[in-house]
Amino acid sequence: MSLTLRVLAPDQNVFDGSADEVILPSTTGQLGILTGHISMLTAIDVGVLRVRANGSWNSIALMGGFAEVDSDEVTVLVNKAELGSSIDANAAEADFQKATTAVAGMEGQPASPEKVKAQQQLNEARARMQASKSAD
């Protein structure tokens, strides 16, 4: 028995297939899903979704959204997502370093829309970098 996983973004169907295990980056921490899991709805944080299918792990960078688990079906609706295998690891690392520098440059400044945006870009760059490295 396996799970059916669907990862949907506004512009694409990122993943649609079966999985033995799914680990979601929920807003309250990592959430592991196996067959027979109780039905639930959870908020998804910016992070990496991990999928185990046929003994191997794959990663998907998620940029926030929601997930529903019901009758061994996991549906993840996100703002944006990328398969780890399609992310250029070197470019993701460079984006992460650039975002880290931008956030560090705002250290000690009062809260502002620019500071919030910089932190969000850092979180997204971190997720992309982690997903690209997990794809190896």
Curated annotation (Swiss-Prot):
Residues 104-136 are annotated as: Disordered. It is found in: Cellular thylakoid membrane. It is a peripheral membrane protein. Its main location: membrane. InterPro entries: ATP_synth_F1_dsu/esu, ATP_synth_F1_dsu/esu_N, ATP_synth_F1_esu_C, ATPsynth_dsu/esu_N. GO terms for cellular component: plasma membrane-derived thylakoid membrane; proton-transporting ATP synthase complex. It comes from the Bacteria. Pfam families: ATP-synt_DE, ATP-synt_DE_N. Keywords: ATP synthesis, CF(1), Hydrogen ion transport, Ion transport, Membrane, Thylakoid, Transport. One of its GO terms (molecular function) is proton-transporting ATP synthase activity, rotational mechanism. SUPFAM superfamilies: Epsilon subunit of F1F0-ATP synthase N-terminal domain. PANTHER family: ATP SYNTHASE DELTA/EPSILON CHAIN, ATP SYNTHASE EPSILON CHAIN, CHLOROPLASTIC. Belongs to the ATPase epsilon chain family. F-type ATPases have 2 components, CF(1) - the catalytic core - and CF(0) - the membrane proton channel. CF(1) has five subunits: alpha(3), beta(3), gamma(1), delta(1), epsilon(1). CF(0) has three main subunits: a, b and c. Produces ATP from ADP in the presence of a proton gradient across the membrane. This is ATP synthase epsilon chain. It comes from Synechococcus sp. (strain CC9902). The gene is atpC.
